[in-house]
Amino acid sequence: MAGIARLPESVANKISAGEVVQRPVSVVKELLENAIDAGADRISVIISDAGKELVRIVDNGCGMERDDALLSVERFATSKIRGVEDLEDLSSLGFRGEALASISSVSHFELRTAVEGSPLALSFRYEGGVLVEEARVQGERGTSISVRNLFYNVPARRKFLKSNATEYGHIYELVRSFVLACPEISWQMVNDGEELFNFRTPDLNERLDFFYGSGFAESLVPVTEENDYISIRGFIGRPALQKRRRLDQYFFINRRLVQNRMLSQALQQAYGELLVERQAPFALLFFEMDPSRIDVNVHPAKLEVRFEDERSVRNMFYPVIKRAVRSYDFSPDLASGELPPLSTRYPSPSPIAFQDVAEPAVTKGELYRNYREGAFSTSRPQDNLPEGFQEQLFSPPEPPAGFVGTASLAGSGGNEDEVPLGDAVAEVKIWQLHNKYLICQIKTGLMIIDQHVAHERVLYERAVDVMETSVPNSQQLLFPQKVELRPWDWEIFEEIRDDLYRLGFNLSLFGSRTVMIEGVPQDVRPGSEVSILQDMIAEYSENASKLKLEKRDNLAKSYSCRNAIMTGQKLSLQEMRSLIDSLFATRDPYCCPHGRPVIIKMTLGQLDHMFGRK
């Protein structure tokens, strides 16, 4: 066996570089943090070949004198801290003093820097961590660092880099996060010779609209909270802006971009049922707190932080988001284009094919982490709709017995000025479209309701209330129905048997794995008793395997989904009115228990625009 030997410094540097510099985006992150710490108010990011060939960061920060510049490329040399106690009061983004040493050891590295008043800039060129050239060149105050041929001397690491599209995507997403986090800084980005953006003003709305599409900033919900412990400010997105990934969730703690599972989960749970399964809301949130209450020295790439009291942070953060979510009408706006998921806009030059970027696979663990908070949560809202909501929604407060239907509408040949929209309206106009949607005339235009998901919402909240009060609302069957369950279904039945009784099912055992249905909830359609029970068990099992739902919440969702009015079912006028009245008596009429929208509204102004009247 070979004896133990100390590794040469050049080898040790390459090994340690693997912790800090994992891919081109790691280089960009470290250099951007240094530029911000240097007090720059103008930063340029220039990359070539997705960062494999070139990463150059140019800033107009304070610059460095010669001795400091040489020390900056040495391991564990930094201006940010002097002792371990400084880690408890850290205000800078960088602090370890190993980034430049790690980067220079695996690349062709050039540093140019100049301080205020210096006639010339200093230039230092390194290859594999070794200084090979020093010179004085023309240059302005600030620092420019060029990293070429990344991992040229570590072929194993270079071989495992992903496609240009993937590596470029990581870089773009990182730069975007800094651009949004630091609106006081002017940002420029150039990729393969093409300028992607150049923000010269601190207008955050301009940046949001550029990255996510025109009008995006106006659709966001502001978040503001401040106390002696923590300050929270920023924006969250409407449910219609949700994504299948969390790349558009930005958490900045004391200006540091971090990843934190607790914050992501609390954000997800605050939205509750407004989110479709496995979707994540947009968030751009800034936290300010005493640096001594957080530990940033957790992850080599400084991507994670540890809170001194994580529970207190969550208990402050969750209600803030919950209040913001509840304070807005989240029914989708048809003309705003909210219904389709809003795709992130990646300006890209022709050589890079973004269609090659695959969505990250969703693991079972992520599904459990991303579960939506159900109605049985102790923190769920108990408030009803705002006072006077229905009076504002429908033109007349009470519909009369007579109803003018589609025939009358089709037969009216008057112009728009003859359409009564004020006090002259004598009834609520309701039509069923293709036995699928309900169309209602409202003061501002029209409202479209999905009859299936609307009934789901009604049944879900009824089930929740019934099981919480333990007062079953059951109707007895004249002829009991017999159901034989498969072994795996029987196990589910045994698990939810007591809650089925609370829901209104009166069940008795009849031999091995056989159940007699003697009574059902009053909402169950006659003749569907057996299929409803079987479908509920199947739905409950599927939800349990995919999502982390509380047992009663899962049962209520399964019951409402399987028992709701189906698409294609014709409704009478009275049934439509009853459904709408029941919907707006629920706590949350805007989405079904699974997160799909229930209501879409169109204003007269939007219709006028579509018909060229405006």
UniProtKB/Swiss-Prot annotation:
GO terms for molecular function: ATP binding; ATP hydrolysis activity; ATP-dependent DNA damage sensor activity; mismatched DNA binding. One of its GO terms (cellular component) is mismatch repair complex. PROSITE patterns: DNA_MISMATCH_REPAIR_1. Belongs to the DNA mismatch repair MutL/HexB family. This protein is involved in the repair of mismatches in DNA. It is required for dam-dependent methyl-directed DNA mismatch repair. May act as a 'molecular matchmaker', a protein that promotes the formation of a stable complex between two or more DNA-binding proteins in an ATP-dependent manner without itself being part of a final effector complex. The keyword Iron does not apply. GO terms for biological process: mismatch repair. It holds the Pfam family HATPase_c_3. CDD domains: HATPase_MutL-MLH-PMS-like (cd16926), MutL_Trans (cd00782). Keywords: DNA damage, DNA repair. This is DNA mismatch repair protein MutL. It comes from Chlorobium phaeovibrioides (strain DSM 265 / 1930). Gene3D superfamilies: 3.30.230.10, Histidine kinase-like ATPase, C-terminal domain, MutL, C-terminal domain, dimerisation subdomain, MutL, C-terminal domain, regulatory subdomain.
